[in-house]
Amino acid sequence: MWALDKIKGTTTVGIVCKDGVVLTADRRASLGNMVISKGVTKIFQVDDHLALAGAGAVGDILSLVRALRAESKLYRAKVGKEMSTKALATLTSNILSGRKYLPYFGWFLIGGYDEKPSLYSIDMAGGITEDKYVSAGSGMEFAYSILDNEYSEKITLNNGVKLAIKAINAAIKRDVFTGDGIMVVTIDREGYRELSKEEVEKLLKKL
């Protein structure tokens, strides 16, 4: 868990549901005690049914995403199908472990849907764990206070979205480095979808 000391200024949440995966993140980027952006994207589509959420240095996250997208396209060209979630997580782990002395500063969530929904968390040294739900970043303790009490393996995607928003919102209320809106992505049998700002605000009002 040593890598968490390097990660400030964001909160991400991932949840495995019966029928898909939810990834959420706030939109604030900070440098020290200063907010430097209020509209940062922290969740990225890698392929039709694959995505990465990152907590940490924005430049490092973007560099990793570019590498994963390139490898994913190459895999499709060679094999003729999309990479599995586990394969993408393993690839991410291998890339990170190969840069231990010049690391990507971040904590990464890989979510996807192939034969079933799955979710992996990967630290910047390449340590990998498969999770049912996970949070990373400066507000993770507040997000976990919600997730630990309310998560169920029987949760549906719709209810998983509500739970993820509730968890991120708890971090926004308590963590000064987390804020400025919530990005929500779902991945199910049909593929990757980002909820609109209006959809998220509507769900927030119902909390």
Swiss-Prot record:
The formation of the proteasomal ATPase PAN-20S proteasome complex, via the docking of the C-termini of PAN into the intersubunit pockets in the alpha-rings, triggers opening of the gate for substrate entry. Interconversion between the open-gate and close-gate conformations leads to a dynamic regulation of the 20S proteasome proteolysis activity. The active site is at 10 (nucleophile). GO terms for biological process: proteasomal protein catabolic process. SUPFAM superfamilies: N-terminal nucleophile aminohydrolases (Ntn hydrolases). GO terms for cellular component: cytoplasm; proteasome core complex, beta-subunit complex. Residues 1-9 form a propeptide. It catalyses: Cleavage of peptide bonds with very broad specificity. One of its GO terms (molecular function) is threonine-type endopeptidase activity. Its EC number is 3.4.25.1. It comes from the Archaea. Keywords: Autocatalytic cleavage, Cytoplasm, Hydrolase, Protease, Proteasome, Threonine protease, Zymogen. It is found in: Cytoplasm. Belongs to the peptidase T1B family. The 20S proteasome core is composed of 14 alpha and 14 beta subunits that assemble into four stacked heptameric rings, resulting in a barrel-shaped structure. The two inner rings, each composed of seven catalytic beta subunits, are sandwiched by two outer rings, each composed of seven alpha subunits. The catalytic chamber with the active sites is on the inside of the barrel. Has a gated structure, the ends of the cylinder being occluded by the N-termini of the alpha-subunits. Is capped at one or both ends by the proteasome regulatory ATPase, PAN. Component of the proteasome core, a large protease complex with broad specificity involved in protein degradation. This is Proteasome subunit beta 1. The gene is psmB1.
